[in-house]
C-alpha cells in the first residue's frame, strides 16, 4: 500500500526482487535500456534485498540497445545477436546467476532470436501478481 492511495499497489521491480529472493538468487545481471540503467531504479528497489545487481560494461550496454532498437523494434528477424550474446556472457562471467529482462522488448527478443539464458521477466512477475491480487489462480507450468 502506498501512503497516497487507498488501494494496493503492485510494484513490478520490488516484486521481481522478492521472486529472485525466493529462488535464492544473490547476483543478477540487469539488461535494460540506457535510461533504466542510468536511473538506478533497480538498485534503489533492490536495496536491502541481498541481491547484487550487475550492469553491462558500456560496450555491452550498447549491444543491448542495438538489439532492442535495431533488432526487435525494427522487426528484423535475421538480426545478428552475437554482440548481445557477448554482453550476456559478460554478465554471467561477472557472476550473475540469472538475467533481469528489465525492458519489455527483451522477452520477445529471447523468443524471436532463440536466446536461451537463465532469466526473469519482470512484466510476467507483475502479471502473475496481478492475477493473484485479483483473486485468480495461476495455471501450473
Spans of model-derived segments:
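Non-catalytic structural scaffold of enzyme domains
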Residues: 1-141
